[in-house]
């Protein structure tokens, strides 16, 4: 490291203080306390020796800021290797201060973008010591010195102006052309840190990768933001649809070229085969291999058996949901009543609102015909 004389160090310290202190102009503060300073670590980076530098103490500015206009003429440009300046501020006790960054503007946008800060542009000075970082984002496109403006206003709780940057305060930053190995693609540019800064929708070391949202599926390649190139057999904005040469049947869905996802009760290349070799009866649905889900009122492997609740007992057979067919000599809703005196079933059947065809046929049969051996009784 090159040797610095005390005179040179003093000059550097003065320049840094002018740069940071020039952001603010002193004003009288009747009550409350505010501090602003550069910590020792930041001072070492800026001026080469380690000590805290006070900018504002108890609401009063350092004396060198009072004649900022003259000092500004002697202020050097910020060096290439300094990308930002940090200062710390704090409002102690119950004091309330409010700030506003009114101007953050680069006058040479082809060399440097607008200055940045890491805090909201409008807010209150925190009661806990907090770091404010002012950044100087060189574009890295060319060598040169960029001029920029920073205007900040600080007020107390009563709206009185406490601190204010002089209007049209101009600062300077030295920038140089950056070189990123491999270059930056898709409109990205190389910043002064030799890192590619990508346009929206691109990422990667060289901005070579596009960002698709949602992402490209089934091996699709994102070529530009929101544009997928699909592999053979797929299509759609995200390559989410397969192109099947044959149509999937019975509600099947094509998920891969030539392949179908079948509904639960079907199988086969095109979902053309039912999983139940014998069809489910009485409205039942096939839910798996030879497995039926029966509709209400039926049960059995093929849903061929009706359910009667209560049952038809020992003298009847359930032939339809809640409908019993009684054996000869028995009648009643559940076939639990015996005929007396040898009277035939056809002579003792009570009318029903829900007659089966066999009941109607038995009633309309000629008197000479033989009585039916069975009967639906409701």
UniProtKB/Swiss-Prot annotation:
The record, for Gene3D superfamilies, names: Laminin (2.10.25.10), Wnt, WIF domain (2.60.40.2170)
Which stretch is the leader sequence?
1-28
One GO CC annotation, please?
extracellular region
The chain positions of domain WIF read 36-175
Q: Does the keyword Aminoacyl-tRNA synthetase apply?
A: no
What SMART domains does the record tag this protein with?
EGF, WIF
Task: Report residues carrying sugar chains.
Answer: 86, 243
Q: Where is this region: Disordered?
A: 343-378
Tissue expression: Highly expressed in unsegmented paraxial mesoderm.
Concerning PANTHER family, the annotation shows: EGF-LIKE-DOMAIN, MULTIPLE 7, EGF-LIKE-DOMAIN, MULTIPLE 7, 8
Q: What is the protein's name according to its record?
A: Wnt inhibitory factor 1
* UniProt source species: Danio rerio
